[in-house]
Each structure stands twice: as C-alpha cells, then as structure tokens.
Swiss-Prot record:
Binding site for substrate: S138
Gene Ontology CC terms: cytoplasm
Gene expressing this chain: Adh
Quaternary structure, from the entry: Homodimer.
Domain of life: Eukaryota
Keyword list, A-Z: NAD, Oxidoreductase
Protein name per UniProt: Alcohol dehydrogenase
Length: 254
C-alpha cells in the first residue's frame, strides 16, 4: 500500500508505539490521518501537523469499549467527511491483569467492534470498495508471558480474529494483517500488574531482556503497511521486521 495521498484512521495513535508510528506515517505524506484516542493530546496533534503541513490531521475522542452502534456512528461522521478511507489501524491496548474485564474489552472486543463497524463502509457485498485493516496484536499471541495470562490471552484472541478475517478477504474485499511488537520501551511495560500479583517484579524482570525502541517499532510498522500482505503475521522485535509462518496443527477443512 502506498501511504502517500491515502486516508488513514489510527485508533490509539497517540500512545507510545502509536505516536511514533503516527510520526512515521505523516512523514510518508498521507492525505488525511484521523486519530481516534481516548485521551486528547493537543501537543502531539500540533507536532504531527507541524511535521508535514500538507497532511490533514484530525482528532476524535474515542473509547474502544463503547457499544458497536456508537463506533458505527463515529465512522459514519468520518466517512461523510473523507468519502473514502484506505487503512484502519487498531492500536488500543492496556497491560494490567488486575483489570480483567477491561483488558479483554480494550485488547480484544474493541478491536473486533471497530473492525466490524468499518465493514459497513468497506464490505464489497454491500457495494463497498474494500480496504485494509492493520491490527496491533503482540508476540504474546505466539507465546504468553505467563505472569500476565489475561493480557496474553487477549492478544492471542486478537491475533486469531485477525488471521480469520484475512481468510475472508475474497468475500469482503478487505485486506487484514497483524502487527506483533516484541518488548518495546513504552510506559505500558515500565510498570504493570501481574495476575493475582503472582510476580510483583514482572515489569522489572521483563525489561532485563533485550528490547527495542518505539521508533524502531514504528519504522518497521510503516514497512509492513507498505508491504500490504493479506494474512501476514508480522513480528516487530529487536528492531527487525519478520513474517511469521504459523504452524498448522488442525484445519476445519471448510
């Protein structure tokens, strides 16, 4: 996918990985970048606008845990304004295994609902033009961090949802792939709670392992966007971008 002159919606585009990715996207010259985030950050929006004045940056407050109908209403507002959208990035995520329901709601259900909502505008069975969805999942969807089983399970669920949608591309006309960062130096991983406090030092122990910067992750994220490979399971770890070959142990045969 060519980012230049495209219209992009980025859910949670002002967070750690999100903000650096927004910066890299803006440098590539899209026509519009629409940022949906729970928390407004006027300074970050101003920075993005200054980075490339030719790009129109728009912000809408959005909590991914709202009902599906509210998400559809917001997307209708955006589509009415832009007419077309080329790429949806689902990037909302929390890491706190003491908040079980919210972890699942943000990391999994929010991704499902936002993706489902945009199908009203993209699905070729409804006369839509198709589009592209990039879901930010996690390497914990491959192998869990067992001290945070709720977080790991939510990301595994998001990954499974994403790979399923990719197999429906011939029906919907929508390309779908996953972005799976490894341990990245963000606020998210500097302090978080394990499930039932099984490991009070989990964040500290995790950061003893090799990490990557948010900039390294963002630069590889843009490469994955440009590759635009339906069904790709991208691992973004230690400053590298690698396509993961999923081992199949069972097949529905459908």
């Amino acid at each position: 996918m060519v980012i230049a002159n495209s219209n992009i919606i980025f859910v949670a585009g002002l967070g750690g990985i999100g903000l650096d990715t927004s910066r890299e996207i803006v440098k590539s010259g899209p026509k519009n970048l629409v940022v949906l985030d729970r928390i407004d950050n006027p300074a970050a929006i101003a920075e993005l606008k200054a980075l490339n004045p030719k790009v129109t940056i728009t912000f809408y407050p959005y909590d991914v845990t709202v009902p599906l109908a509210e998400t559809k209403k917001l997307l209708k507002t955006i589509f009415d304004k832009l007419k077309t959208v080329d790429l949806l990035i689902n990037g909302a995520g929390i890491l706190d295994d003491t908040q079980i329901e919210r972890t699942i709601a943000v990391n999994f259900t929010g991704t499902v609902n936002t993706t489902t909502a945009i199908m009203d505008f993209w699905d070729k069975r409804k006369g839509g033009p198709g589009g592209v969805v990039a879901n930010i999942c996690s390497v914990t969807g491959f192998n869990s961090i067992y001290q945070v089983p709720v977080y790991s399970a939510s990301k595994a669920a998001a990954l499974s949802f994403t790979t399923s949608l990719a197999k429906l591309a011939h029906i919907t006309g929508v390309t779908v792939y996953s972005i799976n960062p490894g341990i990245t130096k963000t606020v998210l991983v500097h302090k978080f709670n394990s499930w039932l406090n099984v490991e009070p030092r989990v964040a500290e122990l995790l950061l003893e392992h090799p990490t990557q910067t948010t900039l390294q992750c963002a630069q590889n994220f843009v490469k994955a966007i440009e590759a635009n490979q339906n069904g790709a399971i991208w691992k973004l770890d230690l400053g590298r971008l690698d396509a993961i070959e999923w081992t199949k142990h069972w097949d529905s045969g459908i």
